[in-house]
Amino acid sequence: VRRILAVVIVFASLGWSASATAQLRIVNYNVNNSDPAAFGPRTGMDAVFRGMNASAKGGFARAIDVLILGEAESVATTGTAYAALLNTVTTGTSYLRSTVDAGSTGSGRPIAIFNSSSVSLIAEKKIGSTSGAASQPRQTMRYQFRPIGYDATADFYVYASHYKASTGAANEAERNVEARAIRADADAIGQGARIIYSGDLNFYTSSESGFQTLTGTGNGQAFDPISRVGSWSGSTTYKDVHTQSPATTAVFNGQVTGGMDDRFDFQLITGEVRDGGGFDYIAGSYWAFGNTATHAVNQAISTGSATTLAARIPGYTTTQAQTVLTSLTQVTDHLPVLADYQLPAKMTATLAALPARVIRGGTVSATLTVANAAPVAVAAGADQLDYAYTAAGAVTASGTGSDAALGASNTHVLTISTTVVGLRSGTVSVIASSPQTMSPTFSGTISTS
């Protein structure tokens, strides 16, 4: 005698809220706007921002998500002005400024501008002191960001700094004071934190004590994402990473000239941001924007090849690229540092519905579909989703899978026992192993009666 079994599936799927495509572009830029009479962007900055938004050295173009500014007058003045400019030159965004002013004894302070469509600013913290035995010229700001559509496991930190300038043992020692304060704070966050150390760090060589402090062992150990450590100042070997000065002739009061000969501006990262998983640096994307190593050392960046620059900015003509190069010599006295970062994976899992009734002893299969739903525009914009699935009770299945961002999703067949009449149930579980995965677990129940 054959009995008919009614089959019911109950499942829980941890999904995600839709958000804008959001692999992240982070830029730090000393803009020399500390003068209260000249706190806003200079003529030509719009061309620089448009060029950065369109540049694709890492393989894709992306509007700036986080902009760290050095030598800002204040968040209320410089911050408001730059957020307004970015909202003008970039569509589909909503740029906001940070809210806390770091202490400063001169030459402004670091601030942050961020695209609230792609990241949230979770916290701001001042690091160090401008007075006392361990004083520094300007406090560092620590910003805690979270990608939109993710939870706290995807948070990352950006330290925004402007270290003591100039050569000499006393200045080097002062830079080390700043580096020690930052490392103490970063180490206290704990092992596994994803950190970017950004800003005008004013190092002339990687042998400086301050650079060694940042890159020393410990929770917050910094690494150069492009592995270009050495004696940068005045060296033709390192002209591709030089950031100051793009100008040889001053066009505004206080502009430092002298041509391109120093790597003062950096994005250094902790090991967790270069291990290939979760929030992570995208290899090949880091550069001093506008520097194609086609200029001469100690000459203006505008002596470089517009043709070579246009090749890194899809859709740009050599004329447009030359406008960018010229603007870089006029808007400030540093080049911006630009790098792209991937987002963590985002898992979705579903169980397909079964027929309401099946024949006892027949072969019944269910399907489990797992996908990487990271909200990106290109596959390189998010980590690969790696996972394992298991089943228990009346359901038989186990295995592993991977899905790239923008992948086609994976379907796994589950076998359900129908040999016994009466209530039969089983569970299906999926656990992601990719770091920081959003919605990393799934559990579904299959019942028969």
Give the role of each language-model region.
Residues 22-346, 381-386, 392, 442-444:
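Divalent cation-coordinating acidic motifs and surrounding scaffolds
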Residues 13, 104, 134, 149, ...:
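Sterically constrained small-residue positions within well-ordered secondary structures
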Residues 343-449:
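Feature for long, exposed domains in two main contexts
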Residues 4-13:
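Sec-dependent N-terminal signal peptides
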